[in-house]
Amino acid sequence: MIFLYKIFGKWDPTEVEVKDLGIKRYVSLTPVIVPHSSGKHARQQFNKSEISIVERLANNLMRTETNTGKKQVTLRAVEEAFDIVNKKTKQNPIQVLVDAIANAGPREEVVRLKYGGISVPKAVDTAPQRRVDTALRYISMGTNAAAFKSKRSVAECLATELIGAANRDTKSFSINRKDAKERVAKAAR
């Protein structure tokens, strides 16, 4: 009998399917009980794509000054958010997270080129790893913005942000940010 680890002892990452083939290599679904690698990925430049996507979400949620270094609190909030997502959608919350990342990552961005002292915006395709990083950043920024000075907990805000991003809801902060970035890139073509 082969025993597979489940994230938080509840959610099986092996049954999750990454539908966006561009980011499949950068979304790690390794089975771990507790998504906490103690920064082992920091030794090499692009090694962050080897750690669990749930841990990367928790690390991004620790961005604000009040949450810095409080990984256990953040992991508890992520676990509660996953329970809320499971109750509302009746799906594996890791699948909802992967769909949210695929939908919230911008496909096109703008860079500034200098032609004779004049800066000209130019639309470029976004690298897959940057798409995943940007999507995680937008999801965590939306969660922190919704929970700040609010009666709702971080777990509730994270659950609504994940569900909204997975459904491509324009009320979601991450989808709104992605659309704005792609709109600017479309204008700069």
UniProtKB/Swiss-Prot annotation:
GO terms for cellular component: cytosolic small ribosomal subunit; ribosome. GO terms for molecular function: mRNA binding; rRNA binding; structural constituent of ribosome. Keywords: Ribonucleoprotein, Ribosomal protein, RNA-binding, rRNA-binding. GO terms for biological process: ribosomal small subunit assembly; translation. Transmembrane segments: none annotated. Belongs to the universal ribosomal protein uS7 family. One of the primary rRNA binding proteins, it binds directly to 16S rRNA where it nucleates assembly of the head domain of the 30S subunit. Is located at the subunit interface close to the decoding center. This is Small ribosomal subunit protein uS7. It comes from Methanosarcina acetivorans (strain ATCC 35395 / DSM 2834 / JCM 12185 / C2A).
